[in-house]
């Protein structure tokens, strides 16, 4: 069963290292994606005065292509937009356009209040 959990230890860093991913992140919080207790993905969020800043999203290659990256991204955005007016991405990528982000300087940004997630039951559009 899938679940997402914020973590503050170094387990996400170890996971990424074992996956061959090298990144220099600023201090923040990792959000881990687990399937049946095994970490299969991670996102890293740093914090500015007025924004949560997504610095990276990773899903193990064997589990890509089925929407898990979207799931992890949306769960991370949901967790960190409740108390800050902005959610930013530290780099530019067309991937984030579908979430409503706009390019700004070297990254992308969206107003937290503008984030909505469509549901399959029609509750949100």
Please place each PLM-identified region on the residue numbering.
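Short amphipathic alpha-helix that is part of the acyltransferase structural core
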Residues: 1-25, 32-34, 119-125
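A generic "binding-loop/recognition-motif" signal
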Residues: 29, 50, 92-94
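Conserved beta-strand in the GNAT
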Residues: 32, 38-46, 51-58
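Acidic/histidine-enriched, beta-strand-rich ligand/metal-binding domains
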Residues: 55-56, 64, 79, 98
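Conserved acetyl-CoA-binding loop-helix of GNAT-fold acetyltransferases
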Residues: 59, 65-78
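Conserved active-site alpha-helix within GNAT-family acetyltransferase domains
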Residues: 86-113
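STAS-like cytosolic regulatory interaction modules
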Residues: 107-125
């Amino acid at each position: 069963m899938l679940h997402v959990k914020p973590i503050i230890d170094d387990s996400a860093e170890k996971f990424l290292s074992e996956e061959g991913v090298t990144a220099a992140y600023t201090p923040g919080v990792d959000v881990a994606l687990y399937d049946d207790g095994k970490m299969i993905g991670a996102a890293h969020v740093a914090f500015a005065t007025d924004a949560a800043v997504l610095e990276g999203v990773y899903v193990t290659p064997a589990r890509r292509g089925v929407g898990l990256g979207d799931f992890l991204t949306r769960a991370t955005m949901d967790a960190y937009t409740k108390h800050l007016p902005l959610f930013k991405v530290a780099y530019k990528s067309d991937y984030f356009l579908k979430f409503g982000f706009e390019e700004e300087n070297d990254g992308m940004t969206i107003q937290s209040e503008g984030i909505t997630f469509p549901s399959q039951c029609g509750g949100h559009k």
